[in-house]
Swiss-Prot record:
GO MF annotations in UniProt: phosphatidylinositol binding; ubiquitin binding; zinc ion binding
Zn-finger segments (FYVE-type): 172-232
Name of this chain's protein: Vacuolar protein sorting-associated protein 27
Source organism per UniProt: Cryptococcus neoformans var. neoformans serotype D (strain JEC21 / ATCC MYA-565) (Filobasidiella neoformans)
GO cellular component, as recorded: early endosome; endosome membrane
Single biological process term from Gene Ontology: vacuolar transport
């Protein structure tokens, strides 16, 4: 109680300050003790030491020669400024303390670490003191230091205003009489100050004492009766109920509790035996026997009673409906009772009536002052009730917001799942569609054919897949007359086309050539021109060397016997591989010779429907009927082929006579081949005119004199072909073909 008499020294404060700023501590802030610093601040706030003495003690340690002590002293001063109270701030802002700090900042002998730390905290304190006018001296010194060139760090964030707000005990008020009972102070009736409110009372009105933690006072001090009543200390005099696990209990208390439990158990057992005497047999042996002589008889009886109670209970758990509901203590509430509500309503109605009458005289309402006192008494509880309801409303609103957010998040999750499922379905559908497209593309993609699969003559006949070979149908004679034939008539022996040929079934392939789908239908091909499509030979203006000849061209020094020619043809037919499309090729002696595709890889292949004739008929036609072609045949050949002088000279003896008719048939087949150009209609008209002009000339071949068998002349053989007989044939016909055909037709007529 030394602080009550205003003592200048406090050993406890000095001890704590020395402990917090000891030179034996580790470098700052490794050994900073926050608990000790707060105890020092509480002593200053509770006025256990005078603020001036506390300031001087801290100043002495800040001015120490030890840099470590200085740094810990500056940290302790900062803690005391924030928790010491306004009375300590006045001493900190005094000229004595501020000058000491400014001198340390300006001194050159100060340690750099101490100087930097002092500048930092000096700036923080100055910025915090700007809001208080009584601390303006500290701010003025701070501005002077900045103006003098002292470098301060950048200003920190605005310091909160409540940082320096500290609850401290109020200042004492002096008076000549007690402020409660109004009794004058005398020599015997001394005055006392309440440490809670600062007012002055006599002994009768301030006889209570209690600690004041809110002011940093941990020991009991004098308070008045009013502060005592407000704190509710009179209700706290009764002993508080013991809380299990928190209140220390002695062995005697435990023994007393055990004895009490035994007595209650015995009483309950005796009561149950009296009520249910018929359920127990007196000859029942005890469940527990005393084996120790000093065993307490009451303990044994209590244990037996407890065991019997456990056996009497059913082993099965009780149903949910039979389980006793736990009793919950009602929550504290500030709701008004019905009587209090009635009191407030009555007072409110009374005041409304007085306002309606406009009278200020309370004599007509004698109970108004009583109602006012009762309403005033209930007012505090009503305010707390309103605050409680407002708090609950705020909590419910926050819970509602959280529920709304949860619902929104759940909806977003569901939307995301649906969108993801739709996206997956769309991707799966697109993937299946691509698989189907790739499957169809692979299934209908034309398979490439190797060069070795083509027939030796370089042509391939089209036969619809999965169809057997069928003999050619006999053509009417009238139709044969109208169709101009490119072959001369045989006067000696005419092959019988109407006789049934030898039927053959050729192996079929599962696929067809990709060009076969563009071939013309068989019904549109004239019977006389039904032959494999050949290549259109462009006119060659330069002479061909005599040494360069086709493989199939043969020069005869003497007539070749028919048997040898037939044997060569049979060997050629036997060595020819089958067609790629499944139908056997028809090798005609007058047809172009086979082409080596290795030397002509780019030659386009054209296919047409060819009514194939049996091989035996073809052999009999050309083996037994050598013919002589009159001179008019050369004119017809000149109408459809280049002139003889542009193709070279004849061989001395001649070549195979059937080669000329083969070239004519190739030229006719190239005219029948469909062209994708818009000039197809004009070409068709030109072809029909040339065929009508060539028909009377063909009829004259039968009337001319034929040479005997085995005799040939120069006119019976065609001109030698150029070496490039099978170049890359163009798909389109030459543009000047129609004009040349018309001129040739006019020359023939002349």
């Amino acid at each position: 109680m030394s602080w009550l008499w205003g003592s200048t020294t406090n050993p406890q404060f000095e001890e704590l300050a020395e402990k917090a700023c000891s030179p034996l501590n580790l470098p700052y802030p490794q050994s900073e003790d926050i608990a000790t610093a707060l105890e020092v601040a509480d002593m200053i706030r509770s006025k256990a030491i005078q603020p001036k003495m506390a300031m001087q003690s801290l100043k002495k340690r800040i001015a120490s020669k030890n840099g470590r002590v200085q740094m810990y002293a500056i940290g302790l001063t900062d803690t005391c400024i924030k928790n010491g109270g306004d009375h300590f701030l006045l001493e900190v802002a005094s000229k004595e303390f501020v000058d000491e700090l400014s001198n340390l900042i300006k001194a050159t002998t100060t340690s750099p670490e101490v100087k930097q730390m002092l500048i930092k905290y000096f700036q923080q304190w100055a910025l915090a003191f700007k809001s208080k006018s009584e601390l303006s001296f500290f701010v003025e010194v701070y501005n002077e230091l900045r103006a003098s060139g002292i470098t301060f760090p950048p200003p920190p964030a605005p310091v909160p205003s409540h940082l320096l707000t500290t609850t401290t005990a109020p200042a004492w008020v002096d008076s000549d009489a007690c402020m409660r009972c109004r009794s004058a102070f005398t020599f015997t009736n001394r005055k006392h100050h309440c440490r809670n409110c600062g007012l002055v009372f006599d002994q009768a009105c301030s006889s209570h004492s209690m600690p004041l933690p809110k002011y940093g006072i941990t020991e009991e001090v004098r308070v008045c009766d009013g502060c005592w009543a407000k704190a509710g200390r009179n209700k706290a005099d009764a002993p508080a109920p013991a809380v299990p696990g928190r209140t220390p209990r002695s062995r005697a208390d435990l023994d007393a509790d055990l004895q009490r439990a035994i007595e209650l158990s015995l009483a309950e057992s005796q009561h149950s035996q009296n009520r249910h005497h018929s359920h127990f047999t007196p000859s029942e042996p005890p469940l527990a026997h005393g084996t120790v002589e000093d065993e307490d008889e009451q303990m044994r009886l209590a244990i037996e009673a407890s065991l019997r109670d456990m056996e009497a209970r059913p082993s099965a758990p009780a149903g949910l409906g039979e389980a006793p509901e736990p009793e919950y203590r009602p929550l504290p509430t500030f709701d008004l009772s019905p009587r209090e509500n009635e009191t407030i309503l009555t007072f409110s109605n009374t005041m409304d009536q007085m306002a309606a009458y406009g009278e200020r005289d309370l004599r007509r309402f004698p109970h108004a002052h009583v109602l006012a006192e009762q309403a005033n008494t209930v007012g505090g509880r009503l305010r707390r009730n309103v605050e409680e309801k407002s708090t609950k409303q705020q909590m419910l609103m926050e819970m509602q917001d959280k529920l709304s957010q949860a619902v929104n998040l759940y909806g977003q999750i569901l939307d995301g799942q649906q969108a993801y499922a739709a996206k997956r379905a769309h991707e799966e559908q697109a993937r299946r569609y691509q698989q189907q497209q790739s499957y169809y593309t692979q299934q209908y993609q034309p398979q490439p054919q190797l060069y070795g699969q083509y027939p030796p003559n370089g042509y391939q006949a089209f036969v619809p897949p999965q169809q057997a070979y069928q003999p050619p149908q006999p053509q009417p004679e009238a139709q044969a007359q109208h169709a101009p034939s490119l072959y001369p008539t045989m006067p000696y022996t005419t092959p019988n086309f109407t006789s049934p040929p030898q039927e053959r079934v050729y192996p079929q392939q599962s696929h067809s050539s990709p060009y076969s789908q563009w071939s013309p239908a068989p019904s549109h091909v004239q019977p006389g021109l039904a032959r494999q499509a050949s290549v259109v030979v462009p006119p060659v203006s330069s002479p061909v060397p005599a040494g360069v000849q086709r493989q199939a061209s043969m020069t005869y020094g003497a007539p070749i016997p028919v048997a040898e020619q037939s044997q060569r043809q049979q060997q050629q037919y036997a060595s020819a591989p089958p067609f790629a499309s499944g139908a056997a090729p028809v090798d005609i002696p007058s047809a172009p010779p086979p082409v080596n595709l290795s030397t002509h890889p780019n030659s386009p292949q054209r296919h047409s429907y060819i009514p194939s004739h049996p091989q035996t008929q073809t052999q009999t036609q050309y083996e037994s009927q050598p013919q002589e072609i009159p001179s008019q045949q050369d004119m017809q050949y000149g109408a459809s082929a280049p002139p003889p002088d542009s193709l070279g000279s004849y061989v001395s003896e001649g070549t195979v006579g059937s080669a000329k008719s083969g070239l004519e048939q190739e030229h006719a087949a190239s005219q029948i081949q469909p062209q994708p150009q818009p000039q197809a209609s004009a070409q068709t008209q030109t072809q029909s005119q040339s065929q009508l002009q060539a028909q009377p000339q063909q009829n004259q071949y039968a009337a001319q004199t034929q040479l005997p068998a085995g005799m040939y002349n120069a006119a019976s053989f065609p001109q030698p072909l150029p070496p490039t007989i099978f170049p890359d044939a163009p798909v389109e016909a030459p543009k000047g073909l129609e004009k040349e055909e018309k001129e040739e037709a006019l020359l023939i007529e002349l």
